[in-house]
Design a protein with these regions (language model features):
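N-terminal transition regions in large eukaryotic proteins
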Residues: 1-196, 212, 378-390
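Extended, Lys/Glu/Leu-rich amphipathic alpha-helical scaffolds
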Residues: 84-90, 103-104, 111, 221, ...
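Solenoid-like repeat scaffolds
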Residues: 117, 304-305
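Helix N-cap / loop-to-helix initiation motif
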Residues: 121, 216-217, 291-295
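A generic secondary-structure signal for well-formed alpha-helical elements
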Residues: 136, 215, 231-235
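Active-site-adjacent structural elements in folded domains
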Residues: 173-181, 192-197, 250, 261-286, ...
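Contiguous, well-ordered alpha-helical segments that form the cores/surfaces of helical PPI scaffolds
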Residues: 189-194, 206-213, 222-226, 255, ...
Length: 390
């Protein structure tokens, strides 16, 4: 008879050993970001110069107006593009004057609303987002809290490995994030780490790198906090595990489609395309990576002003503008590809300019309002944040 196999006994490591290993992993990650790449220096200076940063190993002809790096040199600017840049410079002068008299304005100011719907100039986008999110007040109220949260994250956050993985793959085609452990990667890691211990019900979310394109580090942290917890944004319900706000928005959008776009709604049903397949990213990320970047910026300008309403209005606007193309697509795969890929590349090959799309967005807003479809049902109980850690 062959000898019996020896029994294997699992030996559990002492809790103190596991904790020590976790502490070491956290410390190593923080040290990587602290010791590599560009040192932080004066963050206000970094923010002021962020639009002019260039990388020595990248042909500047491959970098577009927004800082994204392309494989091939970009074509020479057309006469219209040069004219557009000149117009933006002139607009910036008017916006700068408006910034100086900010205390005299309200969110409902006709001048402010009209100009925001035309798009905030890139050079002043961060300054106006900061004003619309009331970040000066947040920095004053929470003075010193962000540094304390970073220290706490260094000692206790359980999300750091996942955060590091996300930082590694985020916006690597952008001049601010393309070098591993560079300044903006360090800021992104620090903000996500701090937020993971500040709002333990969510941990962290994926819009931070986009905000960092236009805001300095600490302002970005409090911008994230405002967007998640404060009206008219209150995105908390999009990110908690049961996604209550996402489902509420998707249910309401079904009503909008049934009433305002019945042919599109029927067509989608015919090919078993449910709207929740494409609206999940539209609503949770406010169209980030879902539409051309320049158009996304225009939508975010309006989102900073009006909040969550633009999520539904833009969804309706997208389908309304593209309704004829959608109805001519005769398979699930073709419909899904159009909504997930073609819209992101060129808004479905529309002949409309971005200004015209935003004008149509305004029209869609008024139509939803006329049909009592602009306002959603009230928040559900599980959409409210119960605690923040300070």
């Amino acid at each position: 008879m062959p000898p019996s196999s020896p029994s294997l006994t699992k030996v559990n490591k002492p809790a103190s050993t596991v904790i020590a290993k976790q502490n070491d992993e956290r410390e190593k990650l923080f040290l990587l970001y602290e010791s590599s790449g560009t040192t932080a220096g004066d963050d206000s200076a970094a923010a002021a110069n962020m639009q002019s940063q260039r990388l020595s190993d990248v042909d500047t002809n491959c970098i577009d107006h927004y800082g994204f790096i392309h494989e091939k040199p970009l074509t020479t600017m057309s006469v219209n593009e040069r004219k557009q840049i000149q117009n933006e410079i002139k607009r910036s002068e008017r916006w700068q004057k408006m910034l100086q008299k900010w205390t005299q304005l309200t969110r409902q100011s006709e001048q402010l609303r009209r100009r925001i719907y035309k798009g905030i100039p890139s050079s002043l986008r961060g300054a106006f987002w900061s004003k619309l999110l009331n970040l000066d007040e947040q920095l004053r109220i929470h003075k010193g809290h962000y540094e304390l949260l970073k220290t706490k994250a260094r000692l206790t956050s359980t999300y750091l490995v996942q955060i590091d993985l996300d930082v590694h793959r985020t916006y690597r085609n952008h001049q601010m994030f393309c070098n591993r452990y560079c300044l903006r990667q360090k800021h992104l890691f620090s903000i996500l780490a701090a937020y993971s211990v500040y709002n333990t019900e969510i941990g962290y979310c994926q819009i931070v790198a986009f905000l960092l394109l236009y805001l300095p580090e600490e302002e970005t942290f409090w911008a994230l906090s405002q967007l998640i917890t404060k009206a008219p944004y209150t995105t908390f319900g999009f990110f908690v595990p049961s996604f209550p706000k996402l489902f509420r928005f998707q249910e309401h959008f079904e009503k909008i489609m049934k009433k305002m776009l019945p042919k599109v709604y029927k067509h989608f049903n015919q090919y078993q395309l449910e709207s929740n397949l494409f609206t999940i990213r539209w609503f949770m990320l406010c169209y980030l990576d879902c539409l051309p970047f320049e158009l996304v910026l225009r939508i975010w300008d309006i989102y900073m002003l009006d909040g969550e309403q633009v999520l539904l209005t833009m969804a309706y606007c997208i389908l309304k503008i593209n309704r004829k193309k959608l109805i001519h697509l005769k398979t699930f795969d073709n419909l899904n590809t159009f909504l997930k890929n073609e819209l992101r590349q060129n808004f479905g090959n529309t002949t409309l300019t971005y200004d015209e799309i935003i004008e149509e967005l305004n029209v869609c807003h008024d139509k939803l309002k006329q049909n009592n479809l602009l306002h959603l049902p009230p928040l559900k109980e599980n959409e409210f944040l119960t605690r923040l850690e300070l």
